Amino acid sequence: MRGAYYVAIAFLVAASSRTAAEFDQAEPQPAINNDILTSGGTVNEMLPKRVLRGSRDLKDKLAVYANDEQRTFDLFPNENNFSKALNPTITKTANVMRADRDDVMAKAAEQ
């Protein structure tokens, strides 16, 4: 098992050194046009539409639209109702955590 561990470490080191060797270490320099960056003598156009492009498939279940979101604060007309509804929940959670902590401490003391 120890040999497999050493082999795995060797593969990870080799992969990371290969990645570091392929990486262009020149700092990106801003060009005259804000949409173009130069890196090591090459010109790279920045296309934000391609970087953060969403799925064009209408059947995509992962697409989330702003009008589909449910806001927690919209459920309560004002802050007072929100805090009144939240206080019992916080109190109950704190009591459960306190009781569990006491049980754990009692069990540890018994051992």
UniProtKB/Swiss-Prot annotation:
Where does this protein chiefly localize?
A: secreted
The answer to whether keyword Lyase applies is no
Where does the record say this protein resides?
Answer: Secreted; Host nucleus; Host cytoplasm
Range of residues in the leader sequence: 1-21
GO cellular component annotations, sorted alphabetically?
Answer: extracellular region; host cell cytoplasm; host cell nucleus
Keywords annotated in UniProt: Glycoprotein, Host cytoplasm, Host nucleus, Secreted, Signal, Virulence
Chain ranges for the short sequence motif RxLR-dEER as given in the UniProt record? 50-71
> Which residues are glycosylated according to the annotation?
81
Q: Looking at the record's lineage, which domain of life comes first?
A: Eukaryota
Q: How does the record comment on the protein's domains?
A: The RxLR-dEER motif acts to carry the protein into the host cell cytoplasm through binding to cell surface phosphatidylinositol-3-phosphate.
Q: What does this protein do?
A: Secreted effector that completely suppresses the host cell death induced by cell death-inducing proteins.
- Annotated family: Belongs to the RxLR effector family.
**Name the UniProt record assigns to this protein:** Secreted RxLR effector protein 159
Organism of provenance = Plasmopara viticola
